[in-house]
Amino acid sequence: MEIILAKRAGFCFGVKRATQMAFEAAEKEGKTYSLGPIIHSPQVVHRLEEMGVKVLKGLGEITDGTIIVRSHGVTSEELEEAVRKELEVVDATCPFVKKAQENVQNLSEAGYEVVVVGDADHPEVQGIVSYAKGKVCVVGSEEEAARLPKMKKIGIVAQTTQSFDNLKHVVLECLRKGAEIRIFNTICDATAVRQQEATALARTVDCMIVIGGYNSANTKRLAEVCAELQPRTHQIETAQEINPAWFEGVAKVGVTAGASTPKWLIDEVIERIREIDSAKTS
């Protein structure tokens, strides 16, 4: 059985940067906290916890120590609270997310009503929204955009892991809602390239394996776009979840991984597939 790994599977620039900053912070003396999971990989979060990094939902009673800001960013209020408490802040926010936050703030200050295209429940979006100083709403789809009221000036940004097609459809609806529209395409290039690679690979294989946390938006989207072309698509977090029955009648299997998936997890999955293949042929 041939195993084909997508070229850009695994850590993107922002995640690689964030994990490196987190592990460096964990090695220093003193209390270290992560304001939310550093990335959407339970396995990486567990390794940091073993090094003493405690994941927090909020700053609460924390009065000292180092706070690591996750790659998805946090709200402006949380960041201000950390500064007010004079905590040491290691800001591991992805630069692409940071740019979206800045765009929202600038649009808002310029008098635009802001539309954020994305998942309202995602921490990245909640952080981006917090930088608006005026009216702001989150739109997840073309249908939701159609329900927006008329507005004079609309400013649009996107969650970095959104698909370009969804952004395009929302923008087209917004054109019907306002006379003046300003758009910032804040979708990360790595997200678009990964999706293009994954769909190209899904067309040529008999089975697709997508590796990544079940709480990872970009991994979920990878699995969705692959499943549209290859029904035998399976999302997993670890090699232990692989079912040998998935590979019955399979000559070629494609493997890709979300932006928060470490290389060692990808290697374990590929090794497990090889073991299953060897057992079939022995």
From Swiss-Prot:
Pfam families: LYTB
Details of cofactor binding: Binds 1 [4Fe-4S] cluster per subunit.
Active-site residues, Swiss-Prot/TrEMBL: E124 (proton donor)
Enzymatic reactions: isopentenyl diphosphate + 2 oxidized [2Fe-2S]-[ferredoxin] + H2O = (2E)-4-hydroxy-3-methylbut-2-enyl diphosphate + 2 reduced [2Fe-2S]-[ferredoxin] + 2 H(+); dimethylallyl diphosphate + 2 oxidized [2Fe-2S]-[ferredoxin] + H2O = (2E)-4-hydroxy-3-methylbut-2-enyl diphosphate + 2 reduced [2Fe-2S]-[ferredoxin] + 2 H(+)
Necessary cofactors: [4Fe-4S] cluster
GO MF, one example: metal ion binding
Binding residue positions for isopentenyl diphosphate: H40, H72, H122, S216, N218, S260
Positions that bind [4Fe-4S] cluster: C12, C94, C188
Known role: Catalyzes the conversion of 1-hydroxy-2-methyl-2-(E)-butenyl 4-diphosphate (HMBPP) into a mixture of isopentenyl diphosphate (IPP) and dimethylallyl diphosphate (DMAPP). Acts in the terminal step of the DOXP/MEP pathway for isoprenoid precursor biosynthesis.
Chain positions recorded as (2E)-4-hydroxy-3-methylbut-2-enyl diphosphate binding sites: H40, H72, H122, T160, S216, N218, S260
Listed CDD domains: lytB_ispH
Pathway: Isoprenoid biosynthesis; dimethylallyl diphosphate biosynthesis; dimethylallyl diphosphate from (2E)-4-hydroxy-3-methylbutenyl diphosphate: step 1/1; Isoprenoid biosynthesis; isopentenyl diphosphate biosynthesis via DXP pathway; isopentenyl diphosphate from 1-deoxy-D-xylulose 5-phosphate: step 6/6
UniProt keyword annotations, A-Z: 4Fe-4S, Iron, Iron-sulfur, Isoprene biosynthesis, Metal-binding, Oxidoreductase
Binding site for dimethylallyl diphosphate: H40, H72, H122, S216, N218, S260
Recorded superkingdom: Bacteria
EC number(s) recorded for this UniProt protein: 1.17.7.4
NCBIfam families documented for this protein: ispH_lytB, PRK01045.1-1
Name by which UniProt lists this protein: 4-hydroxy-3-methylbut-2-enyl diphosphate reductase
Keyword Oxidoreductase: yes
GO biological process, one term: dimethylallyl diphosphate biosynthetic process
Record family assignment: Belongs to the IspH family.
